[in-house]
């Protein structure tokens, strides 16, 4: 399970070091094999342990090819997917096209989302988080969440 928000830095070569608390889990789950792709709704990347990505990819491929929305989703998620491998220091090299999409430069934020991670530019993350908090205050709690105890 991946959770928490971690502020990190990209090195000059575009490598990101996974925090040590995630490395052993990633090595156990997928031998350090991770897939990165774009988030089509937000300016960030999504990083999946390889087995979780393979399940998602199978589901994406099963979508009807004559459905324009399904084809668009397949093109965006599968088309931008890159296989990454943790090196001996727990780092992955993020391909330039993915860094460009998410505007990743030096300061980045890794956000655990249980079975995957999101990777954000630090400024974009701060702005999005502020916007989400403002929206949550204005919108209130959806009915579906009314029974949760936080």
Swiss-Prot record:
Coiled coil: none annotated. Signal peptide: none annotated. Residues 5-52, 81-124 form the SpoVT-AbrB domain. Transmembrane segments: none annotated. GO terms for cellular component: cytoplasm; nucleoid. It is found in: Cytoplasm, Nucleoid. GO terms for molecular function: DNA-binding transcription factor activity; transcription cis-regulatory region binding. It holds the Pfam family MraZ. The keyword Lipid metabolism does not apply. Its main location: cytoplasm. Belongs to the MraZ family. This is Transcriptional regulator MraZ. It comes from Alkalilimnicola ehrlichii (strain ATCC BAA-1101 / DSM 17681 / MLHE-1). The lineage of its organism: Bacteria, Pseudomonadati, Pseudomonadota, Gammaproteobacteria, Chromatiales.
């Amino acid at each position: 399970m991946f959770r928490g928000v971690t502020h990190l830095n990209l090195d000059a070569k575009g490598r990101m070091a996974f925090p040590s608390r995630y490395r052993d889990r990633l090595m156990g789950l997928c031998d350090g094999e991770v897939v990165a792709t774009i988030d089509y709704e937000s300016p960030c990347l999504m990083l999946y342990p390889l087995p979780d990505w393979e399940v998602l990819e199978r589901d994406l491929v099963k979508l009807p090819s004559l459905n324009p929305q399904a084809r668009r989703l397949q093109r965006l998620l599968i088309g931008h997917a890159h296989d990454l491998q943790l090196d001996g220091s727990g780092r992955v090299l993020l391909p330039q096209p993915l860094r460009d999409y998410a505007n990743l430069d030096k300061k980045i934020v890794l956000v655990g989302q249980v079975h995957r991670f999101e990777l954000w530019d630090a400024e974009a993350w701060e702005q999005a988080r502020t916007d989400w908090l403002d929206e949550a205050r204005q919108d209130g709690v959806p009915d579906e969440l009314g029974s949760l105890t936080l």
